[in-house]
């Protein structure tokens, strides 16, 4: 491995990956590897300025195959794609054309959902990239994180934090008694690095990357409340009522707004074992109560700033 392409480096997961790269630079002889990273013009790149590694910055997008071909131009042997499953087909197709033979794609455990809208599209993308790599005799490793948290714009736990902070009477579907296993982005950054640096172990495999232990959604809410220092009264609402409400919205908007499947997914358990990753590269993620501390501190600091 001498020349590596990386997408998604400016996201929270990517920044923790870069942290691991910098930390292990001498031990793993990273000075002999050339990295090319994808950035948008609007990206904050200050975190790259003091990085001692050989990193080439490419500003652009990979929204189409034509865009992706510009990014992968050159002689590269490995692609680590963190920038979203929806762009996997075009970036893999482009990289194959340029001779890349090793792929690490960050996809999602959403592939396991029994609901069509949530899972079917992901399954189709998985199948397509596998077909492309198989035809090109390229190795493909797929990483599937669960619900990711650790950023105030993660769209997951950050939403829960705001809700817990603002709602003293807190409605929850079916008592919120179903298991999740959210994963801290710092644990993902380390996992991405370990997979990248251990091709002899991780090539051509698939790994679910979940958090430390399964946790009930109601316990997630309670832990957030404890760390925020607030008390909530949780009111259980039957899922049937929520689903009926989604149907009413669907009808009243003349089928323009369809929340039916989203409501169904809200009561779908999403806890997955990471035993395979633990066995292969010592993946050992934090438990939720420890990992979420940093995000709650960031939330409190932002709130204080706004209140000044």
Regions found by a protein language model. Give the residues of each.
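Conserved Rossmann-fold NAD(P)-dependent oxidoreductase catalytic core, especially the SDR/UDP-sugar
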Residues: 78, 89-141
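A conserved pocket-lining segment of Rossmann-fold NAD(P)-dependent short-chain dehydrogenase/reductase
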Residues: 162-183, 191-195, 202-203, 208
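N-terminal Rossmann-fold cofactor-binding loop
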Residues: 38-43, 61-62
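Conserved Rossmann-fold cofactor-binding substructure of NAD(P)-dependent oxidoreductases
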Residues: 56-76
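Mid/C-terminal beta-alpha module of Rossmann-like enzyme folds, strongest
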Residues: 198-258, 274, 280-308
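Glycine-rich "substrate-gating" loop/helix at the edge of Rossmann-like oxidoreductase active sites
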Residues: 146-153, 174-185, 211-213
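N-terminal Rossmann NAD(P)H-binding glycine-rich loop of SDR-like oxidoreductase domains
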Residues: 3-27
